[in-house]
């Protein structure tokens, strides 16, 4: 009888080639799989991990979620401590729990929350270059805040998905889309909570919103972009370094509570 574990993971994506395992590349999936199998004494049948979503190279996470099965039961705190003793310093397990054997980290999600940090300055800040997306020209937060609400709701986001997406259905629902400025840090920050997000969707939305803030697009352009269903209309993609997978939701009551809170 196997025991299924749910793990909440945080990582600095700077030195990872993304989440998904790739040949001859350092990925989150690769280092976590190695640690899990080492903790389990390298079983004959290797343990496989399943993540809630794939992050690209350079993208960070506070709350990536994954699951795996062990052939026996260990106290969740023992699993957390054991994995953290084996994982590299840019990765940490924040929480571990035992879940039903039919739980799936990817398919049981009811929502995800992403955070983006856009740094505005003529030159790159060496201390922010791995943790913010750099934008050379300043954006007007008032224009962005006027426009961002048009992304909320259920839409076909074909304009906001990068080529290479494996999703056949581009309809997603954004429950909440917010932006605010931190003038002392020269940052504009964004937070998006939705049913799920397409490949590079958040980064493309941020790129469009920053162009609106810079006056390169009209404040009311988003409905027309959505209607166009044409990736070429959105043009750019914000840098990966500014994006953080903040939280994955599996319970509607927790999702609704956070929507009220934030």
UniProtKB/Swiss-Prot annotation:
It is an enzyme of class 5 (isomerase). Keywords: Isomerase, tRNA processing. InterPro entries: PsdUridine_synth_cat_dom_sf (IPR020103), PsdUridine_synth_TruA (IPR001406), PsdUridine_synth_TruA_a/b_dom (IPR020097), PsdUridine_synth_TruA_C (IPR020095), TruA/RsuA/RluB/E/F_N (IPR020094). Substrate binds at residue 114. The active site is at 56 (nucleophile). Its EC number is 5.4.99.12. GO terms for biological process: tRNA pseudouridine synthesis. It catalyses: uridine(38/39/40) in tRNA = pseudouridine(38/39/40) in tRNA. SUPFAM superfamilies: Pseudouridine synthase. It holds the Pfam family PseudoU_synth_1. One of its GO terms (molecular function) is RNA binding. Formation of pseudouridine at positions 38, 39 and 40 in the anticodon stem and loop of transfer RNAs. Homodimer. Belongs to the tRNA pseudouridine synthase TruA family. This is tRNA pseudouridine synthase A. It comes from Lactiplantibacillus plantarum (strain ATCC BAA-793 / NCIMB 8826 / WCFS1) (Lactobacillus plantarum). The gene is truA.
């Amino acid at each position: 009888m196997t025991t299924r574990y749910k793990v909440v993971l945080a990582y600095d994506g700077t030195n990872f080639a993304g989440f998904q395992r790739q040949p001859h590349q350092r990925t989150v999936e690769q280092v976590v799989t190695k640690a899990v199998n080492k903790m389990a004494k390298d079983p004959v049948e290797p343990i496989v991990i399943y993540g809630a979503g794939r992050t690209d190279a350079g993208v960070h996470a506070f709350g990536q979620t994954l699951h795996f099965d062990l052939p026996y039961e260990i106290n969740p705190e023992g699993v957390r401590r054991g994995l953290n003793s084996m994982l590299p310093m840019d990765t940490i397990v924040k929480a571990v729990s035992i879940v039903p054997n039919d739980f799936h980290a990817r398919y049981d999600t009811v929502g995800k929350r992403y955070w983006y940090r856009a740094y505005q300055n003529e030159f790159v800040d060496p201390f922010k270059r791995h943790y913010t997306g750099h934008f050379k020209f300043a954006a007007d937060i008032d224009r962005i805040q006027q426009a961002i609400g048009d992304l909320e709701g259920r839409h076909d986001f074909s304009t906001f998905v990068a080529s290479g997406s494996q999703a056949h259905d581009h309809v997603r629902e954004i429950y909440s889309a917010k932006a605010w400025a931190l003038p002392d840090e020269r940052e504009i920050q964004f937070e998006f909570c939705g049913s799920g997000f397409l490949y590079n969707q958040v980064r493309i939305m941020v790129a469009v919103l920053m162009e609106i803030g810079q006056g390169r697009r009209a404040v009311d352009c988003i409905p027309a972009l959505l209607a166009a269903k044409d990736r070429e209309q959105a043009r750019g993609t914000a840098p990966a370094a500014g994006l953080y997978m903040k939280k994955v939701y599996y319970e509607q009551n927790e999702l609704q509570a956070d929507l009220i809170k934030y």
